[in-house]
């Protein structure tokens, strides 16, 4: 059963799933698609061609789907946001719609946890199980792989790609691509280590050991791309292959490796 406060504004044409709750003074635009069991809390705004998956929560004064902060954007362009299931979008977060420079949509996978005051700009592509801590900000066209965690107060430069399973420490500033399963820290961020906490949560000991050996082979000595090419030969671990292919395909470059004890 839907529960819609009398002061909420639901534009004609909005599609609302079963058991939706829309609280006081919330706004839902005409082209939106809201899934089942979604809660839109007081004062939140859902705009443009936005889809929000089942069992999601949009907290007070978050704005999802407003036009991109891109001077080349034209109002007549098809533009929107697609968010998967089980998303949590906390207070005052902003998620802008896409542009014609992408496919017109900013996309976020399932199980996203986007904390207060985060900003996700136009055309960003976020995988599943992403966590953005308070005030993390993503510029246009940023890509985050599955299971990535971005610490609070961390900006990420436009077009940067962060691989699967990475941890970006709080108050860092990221301007280059980060290899899957790595931990990055600093302003500008450098690669510090394998993300051992994240990998141990997801993989068995043998796979974590393979990733640890791969990290040492890739970063401790020699040319990074040559190391990646050599490591790919007869490589059986799919996760190690992901690391190597990412290095070989990077467009913005990989930041230098600095161990945990090096500033």
Swiss-Prot record:
GO terms for biological process: lipid A biosynthetic process. Its EC number is 2.3.1.129. This is Acyl-[acyl-carrier-protein]--UDP-N-acetylglucosamine O-acyltransferase. The keyword Transferase applies. GO terms for molecular function: acyl-[acyl-carrier-protein]-UDP-N-acetylglucosamine O-acyltransferase activity. GO terms for cellular component: cytoplasm; membrane. Involved in the biosynthesis of lipid A, a phosphorylated glycolipid that anchors the lipopolysaccharide to the outer membrane of the cell. InterPro entries: Acetyltransf_C, Acetyltransf_C_sf, Hexapep, Hexapep_transf_CS, Lipid_A_LpxA, Trimer_LpxA-like_sf. CDD domains: LbH_UDP-GlcNAc_AT. It comes from Campylobacter jejuni subsp. jejuni serotype O:23/36 (strain 81-176). It catalyses: a (3R)-hydroxyacyl-[ACP] + UDP-N-acetyl-alpha-D-glucosamine = a UDP-3-O-[(3R)-3-hydroxyacyl]-N-acetyl-alpha-D-glucosamine + holo-[ACP]. Belongs to the transferase hexapeptide repeat family. LpxA subfamily.
């Amino acid at each position: 059963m839907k529960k819609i406060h009398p002061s909420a504004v639901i534009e004609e044409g909005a599609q609302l799933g079963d058991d939706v709750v829309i609280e006081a003074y919330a706004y839902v635009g005409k082209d939106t698609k809201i899934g089942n069991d979604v809660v839109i809390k007081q004062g939140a705004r859902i705009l443009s061609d936005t889809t929000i998956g089942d069992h999601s929560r949009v907290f007070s004064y978050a704005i999802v789907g407003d036009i991109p902060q891109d001077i080349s954007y034209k109002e007549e362009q098809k533009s929107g946001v697609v968010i998967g299931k089980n998303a949590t979008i906390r207070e005052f977060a902003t998620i802008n719609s896409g542009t014609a420079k992408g496919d017109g949509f900013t996309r976020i996978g399932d199980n996203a946890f986007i904390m207060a005051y985060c900003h996700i700009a136009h055309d960003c592509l976020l995988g599943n199980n992403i966590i953005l801590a308070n005030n993390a900000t993503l510029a246009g066209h940023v890509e985050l792989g599955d299971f990535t965690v971005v610490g609070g107060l961390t900006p990420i430069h436009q077009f940067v790609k962060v691989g699967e399973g990475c941890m970006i420490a709080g108050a860092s500033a990221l301007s280059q691509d980060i290899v899957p399963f790595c931990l990055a820290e600093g302003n500008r961020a450098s690669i510090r280590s394998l993300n051992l906490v994240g990998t141990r949560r997801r993989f068995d000991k043998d796979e974590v050991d393979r990733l640890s050996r791969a990290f040492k082979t890739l970063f401790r000595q020699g040319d990074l791309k040559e190391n990646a090419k050599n490591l790919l030969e007869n490589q059986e671990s799919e996760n190690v292959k992901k690391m190597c292919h990412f290095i070989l395909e990077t467009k913005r470059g990989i930041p230098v490796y600095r161990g945990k004890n090096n500033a």
